[in-house]
């Protein structure tokens, strides 16, 4: 399994100078609110995907009165440790380096450093719009389906061009010119998603049984257009409305994965704590499928695990993560709230300083 052997963070939020050696399995960061616990997890996330899970404004990630931040790790890939790092300055310039070479695309870092991130707002997975759930499915395909990323990139280009033509109200021929490419890649993307969902659902059911055995949720995949029509037929049917609205209404960019209980939306029945456990089950199943398909376990980032969970559920989460045989970074206020296994390292975070205990 991949794991982070060392982590250095400079001038990232309130983390002025962090240099730690994480445990290859369990790492628990504790301290008061605002100490910098979440920022540790956020820095790892940023290095993997090139963005934050807390803000869309990257300038907020740079520590006050400084002009840049640096995140650097050594990553064990199964045979050796490789260096992976990023530097970003206040002008927006950033440099990603992998194994001593400048990387041309952040997808290279994401492939090397697969993460399952569970933030303090994880329960929002069920409440927010379908975009976050599409991203959940697409994360899986990115890591298990070699053809996915090129298909997804082509689809985004075709969709962008078609929407621009619709918004500008160009002649119909210039709008429908993009339909063939959009349909070809859209149908292929849908098939990939459908295949992944079919493999994913039994694993999700297995995980959910551990957390909420009395709540047999059912997952439903919606491809983004009517089951009655092909995508080409749907685009033709919608063309008049698409012109009026200035964008493409149907297609894989409208797909969703919804959970129901007794034919009702899960979020209408479950408490916030239960929704959090459902999201944990989803992401643990995601990691299991990645391991089944590739032999690689993701690294888990679990922010504020104790919140809204009683002691039994917290122990259940820890036991499940332990069975996943992955490296995990967990944050919380009180270390006594978590029953950590022996193979763990505790880190105390205070005023942006991190010390192993």
Swiss-Prot record:
The primary location reported for this protein is cytoplasm
Give Gene Ontology CC terms.
cytoplasm
> Which molecular function GO terms apply here?
ATP binding; single-stranded DNA binding
Q: Where in the cell is it found?
A: Cytoplasm
Binding-site positions, ATP: 31-38
Fetch the InterPro entries from UniProt. DNA-binding_RecF, DNA-binding_RecF_CS, P-loop_NTPase, RecF/RecN/SMC_N, RecF_2
| Pfam hit, one | SMC_N
Q: Which UniProt keywords apply?
A: ATP-binding, Cytoplasm, DNA damage, DNA repair, DNA replication, DNA-binding, Nucleotide-binding, SOS response
Q: Which SUPFAM superfamilies match?
A: P-loop containing nucleoside triphosphate hydrolases
Q: List the disulfide bonds.
A: none
- Its GO biological process terms? DNA replication; DNA synthesis involved in DNA repair; double-strand break repair; SOS response
Q: NCBIfam families, alphabetically?
A: recf
Could you tell me which HAMAP family the record lists for this protein?
A: RecF
Q: Provide the function of this protein.
A: The RecF protein is involved in DNA metabolism; it is required for DNA replication and normal SOS inducibility. RecF binds preferentially to single-stranded, linear DNA. It also seems to bind ATP.
Protein family according to the UniProt entry: Belongs to the RecF family.
PANTHER family membership: DNA REPLICATION AND REPAIR PROTEIN RECF
Provide the protein name: DNA replication and repair protein RecF
From which organism does this entry originate? Coxiella burnetii (strain CbuG_Q212)
Question: In the UniProt record, what gene is named as encoding this protein?
Answer: recF
């Amino acid at each position: 399994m991949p794991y982070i052997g060392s982590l250095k963070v400079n001038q990232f939020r309130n983390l002025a100078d962090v240099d730690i050696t994480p445990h290859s399995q369990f790492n628990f960061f504790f301290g008061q609110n605002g100490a910098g616990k979440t920022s540790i997890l956020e820095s790892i996330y940023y290095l993997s995907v090139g963005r934050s899970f807390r803000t869309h404004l990257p300038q907020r990630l740079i520590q006050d009165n400084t002009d840049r931040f640096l995140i650097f790790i050594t990553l064990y890939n199964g045979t050796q440790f490789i260096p992976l790092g990023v530097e970003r300055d206040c002008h927006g310039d950033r440099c990603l380096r992998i194994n001593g070479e400048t990387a041309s695309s952040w997808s290279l870092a994401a492939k090397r450093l697969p993460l399952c991130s569970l933030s303090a707002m994880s329960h929002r997975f069920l409440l927010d719009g379908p975009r976050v759930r599409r991203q959940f499915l697409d994360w899986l395909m990115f890591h298990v389906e070699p053809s996915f990323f090129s298909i997804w990139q082509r689809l985004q280009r075709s969709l962008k061009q078609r929407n621009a033509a619709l918004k500008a109200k160009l002649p119909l021929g210039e709008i429908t010119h993009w339909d063939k490419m959009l349909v070809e890649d859209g149908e292929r993307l849908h098939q990939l998603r459908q295949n992944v969902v079919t493999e994913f659902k039994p694993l999700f059911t297995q995980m959910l049984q551990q957390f909420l055995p009395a709540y047999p949720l059912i997952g439903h995949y919606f491809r983004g257009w009517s089951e009655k029509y092909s995508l080409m037929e749907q685009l033709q049917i919608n063309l008049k409305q698409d012109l009026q609205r200035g964008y493409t209404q149907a297609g894989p960019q409208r797909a969703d994965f919804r959970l129901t209980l007794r034919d009702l939306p899960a979020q209408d029945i479950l408490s916030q704590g239960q929704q959090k456990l459902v999201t944990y089950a989803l992401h643990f199943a995601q990691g299991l499928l990645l391991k089944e398909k590739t032999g690689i376990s993701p690294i888990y980032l679990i922010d504020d695990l104790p919140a809204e969970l009683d002691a039994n559920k917290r122990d259940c989460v820890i036991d499940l993560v332990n069975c996943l045989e992955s490296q995990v970074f967990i944050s919380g206020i009180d270390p006594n709230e978590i029953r950590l296994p022996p193979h763990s390292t505790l880190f105390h975070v205070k005023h942006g300083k991190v010390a192993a205990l």
